[in-house]
Design a protein with these regions (language model features):
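Catalytic center-proximal scaffold of phosphoryl-transfer enzymes
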Residues: 1-281
Length: 281
């Protein structure tokens, strides 16, 4: 029953009321909200070694998609962080949205490439970054819809993105380096031209601030140029966040992070959350 309760709550994303109603119907028993919490807390405690093992694997990953979003605990703002590698997904909820979280989860010597947005914590933590092209292209697209004189900039950015995507691990390193240098020079020219447009200056500043990190994929074509994988894995948690509303305490947040880490990792690897959790317990 504990497997069923936990997955109804965190995999099927049922509200507490519906979780209780489903279990009471299926097992002809009576449940309280405290019982549901106690069960999921015991499951999370048993899952802690597996959770920590995923954290160790995340630390060894050659590249990571990292993202963060707000979450409420007792009405106060916390941050839900996701760390996703090729085969693992790791969630953690913290008060901070800064480098301290990266130091805690990845340690002080992580040398993999981080695919991320423009949060300054990433640049403070590492110089091995790939800025997310999906984010910046959404910004330039929105500007182009509002201002005709922003359309050439958006098209130019799309052309640069096409060059970023065009590189392959089969391309010789020297060829990739030439393309990298060419793209950096092109982007500098773009910034120079469009930074004088006051209504575009915010976006050109964003582009300027990430200049060293837009073209990392050209040198390392094994990585993705967008953080879509991170955002995709975060999406289910965002849906759950809307269903749950505000979490009651940090213990409940810890339960959610641990269970969803395991469920998301199992799904990413094509494993059944039901049988995997049952075997773990």
């Amino acid at each position: 029953m504990q497997t069923q309760i936990t997955l109804l709550r965190f995999d099927d994303r049922l509200p507490l009321r519906k979780t209780i109603a489903t279990i009471e119907r299926q097992y002809e028993t009576t449940l309280t909200s405290k019982t549901v919490y106690d069960v999921t807390k015991r499951v999370a405690d048993k899952a802690t070694p597996a959770y920590n093992d995923i954290k160790r694997k995340i630390r060894r990953a050659t590249h990571l998609h990292i993202d963060e979003t707000k979450i409420k605990i007792q009405g106060k703002t916390y941050w839900l962080w996701i760390f996703r590698s090729r085969n693992n997904v790791f969630f953690v909820i913290r008060k901070q949205r800064n480098r301290k979280v990266l130091d805690e989860i990845l340690g002080y010597r992580y040398r993999g490439i981080i695919i991320c947005d423009g949060l300054s914590a990433y640049e403070e933590y590492s110089r091995y970054l790939q800025r997310c092209w999906a984010h910046i292209l959404r910004e330039t697209r929105d500007l182009a819809k509002k201002h005709d004189d922003a359309k050439p900039m958006h098209q130019w950015m799309k052309d640069l993105f096409a060059k970023v995507k065009s590189t392959s691990v089969r391309d010789p390193p020297k060829k990739r380096k030439r393309l990298y240098d060419k793209c950096v020079q092109e982007m500098k020219k773009l910034i120079e031209i469009f930074s004088s447009y006051q209504h575009i200056s915010k976006v050109t500043t964003t582009i300027q601030n990430g200049l060293d990190f837009w073209f990392t994929r050209i040198i390392h074509p094994q990585i993705e140029p967008t953080n879509n994988n991170g955002e995709r894995s975060l999406r289910e948690m965002v849906v759950m966040k809307k269903i749950i509303g505000t979490l009651r305490n940090e213990d409940g947040a810890d339960v959610m992070a641990k269970v969803m880490t395991l469920v998301s990792t199992w799904r990413l690897n094509g494993a059944s959350p039901y049988y995997s959790l049952k075997a773990l317990l």
